[in-house]
Amino acid sequence: MTVYFIGAGPGDPDLITVKGQRLIRQCPVILYAGSLVPQALLEGHQAGQVVNTAELDLEQIVELLAQAHRRGLDVARVHSGDPSLYGAIGEQIRHLRELGIPYEIVPGVTATAACAALLGCELTLPEVSQTLILTRYAARTKMPEGESLGDLARHRATLAIHLGVAHLAKIVEELLPHYGADCPVAVIHRASWPDQEQVRGTLGDILPKVAARNFRRTALILVGEVLAAEGFADSSLYRAEHRHLYRPGE
């Protein structure tokens, strides 16, 4: 018996991995985060028990996993995006270890990747930014020392900010001294879902643009020069003079 923490991807059912889809269709027990996982992902399952965990607390979820273990039944524990990023699987894994229950993490497509695809851009451009920082706004969960937005902004790297659209004004206030008012920003709401929306602007004008769209949750904020960069240098990867194992020199 194994508990599979499966990344369902950002919303589009076609973006789940082949392995994740196969496990959902094979496992006799499915626990899924119904608030963020589309029902279409569960199509074709043969499970005898399917539970939406949106209204359950940690203790109740762990008990369901333990019950499945006692019955010798594999569990598809389906999370949105990639479960290793803000998936709250750490505390579940801790309980599984204490109970001696095997588990496996099946990666998923991240919201950041889906947003970059929607925007049609690369997040790491030569001589513009080679660093992408995934972070969140500090609301109920406090940030460790040195990880405030102000601290991270000093690097001027590309930022992907989760769980922050409701606090956008404070985010802009913290970033402005480091990035400047002209720094490009994109706010993507429900990336890859049928009703996905995007708003593009700068730190200087993004607030009224987002307010007009009334985004409340399930939005990602991307910040950085890569979002509007033009005339950047080509990478060395495909340069004719660049030699490597598959393109050796003569």
Swiss-Prot record:
It comes from the Bacteria. One of its GO terms (biological process) is methylation. SUPFAM superfamilies: Tetrapyrrole methylase (SSF53790). The keyword Transferase applies. It is an enzyme of class 2 (transferase). InterPro entries: 4pyrrol_Mease, 4pyrrol_Methylase_sf, 4pyrrole_Mease_sub1, 4pyrrole_Mease_sub2, Cbl_synth_CobM/CibF, Siro_Cobalamin_biosynth, Uropor_MeTrfase_CS. It catalyses: precorrin-4 + S-adenosyl-L-methionine = precorrin-5 + S-adenosyl-L-homocysteine. CDD domains: Precorrin-4_C11-MT. Keywords: Cobalamin biosynthesis, Methyltransferase, S-adenosyl-L-methionine, Transferase. Its EC number is 2.1.1.133. Pathway: Cofactor biosynthesis; adenosylcobalamin biosynthesis; cob(II)yrinate a,c-diamide from precorrin-2 (aerobic route): step 4/10. One of its GO terms (molecular function) is precorrin-4 C11-methyltransferase activity. Belongs to the precorrin methyltransferase family. This is Precorrin-4 C(11)-methyltransferase. It comes from Pseudomonas aeruginosa (strain ATCC 15692 / DSM 22644 / CIP 104116 / JCM 14847 / LMG 12228 / 1C / PRS 101 / PAO1). The gene is cobM.
